[in-house]
Amino acid sequence: ERFSISESTRANYARGEDTYDPVLSQAVVFPETNEEVSKILKMCNEHKVPVVPFGTGTSLEGHAVGNQNGITISLEKMNNVLSLNANDFDCRVQANVTRKQLNEYLREDGVFFPIDPGADAALGGMAACSASGTMAVKYGTMRTVVSGLTVVLANGDIIKTGARTKKSSAGYNLTNLFIGSEGTLGIITEVQ
């Protein structure tokens, strides 16, 4: 249930909605926490196993194509809203919460998440790809609305970037370093 080498499961996680030929990874794993992603990446780093993160698979650019010598980490079980501060227009979600799921959650508080790339993408993938959409002129892009991330680095280290404050001049803006990094610097597991 949390680890699969079956061909049918691997085929389901071999590509997104792009036109690239699917590539089956050796296995698909389904972590539920940052710590589980960390353990997986530590092992993969130690044994030099390539990793492909997989959210909802809505990518049109080949981000979700598997690696025949590696594993796919499906974030589908990391789909919870962790906190909401409606008065501050701020929430923290796990990476596989979709924009529609988040907006359903936010509706009763009279707020909404404005980034709409067209597909019902996961917020972790939207951050990794620096998504925008039809309302970007008014509300900005992912780079504008995301104030912090939790990222698991290739060596398994878990880092938190940013803060709940809207303005800060303390230190490097690591949040914007990871937004748009396409998963090359680490796996985004939480978005704030």
Describe these PLM feature segments.
Residues 1-42, 58-89:
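N-terminal flexible segment immediately upstream of the FAD-binding catalytic core
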Residues 6, 54, 74-76, 116, ...:
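Generic beta-strand/beta-sheet core signal
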Residues 9-12, 30-36, 43-46, 60, ...:
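Feature of Fe-S/electron-transfer and energy-metabolism proteins
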Residues 45-47, 54-56, 121, 145:
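Short, basic and Ser/Thr-rich N-terminal targeting/leader segments
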Residues 49-50, 112:
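Residue-level detector of anion-binding/catalytic polar loops
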Residues 53-57, 64, 95, 115-117:
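Glycine-rich, histidine-containing beta strand-loop boundary motifs that form or position
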Residues 80-84, 91-192:
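FAD-binding subdomain of flavoenzyme oxidoreductases
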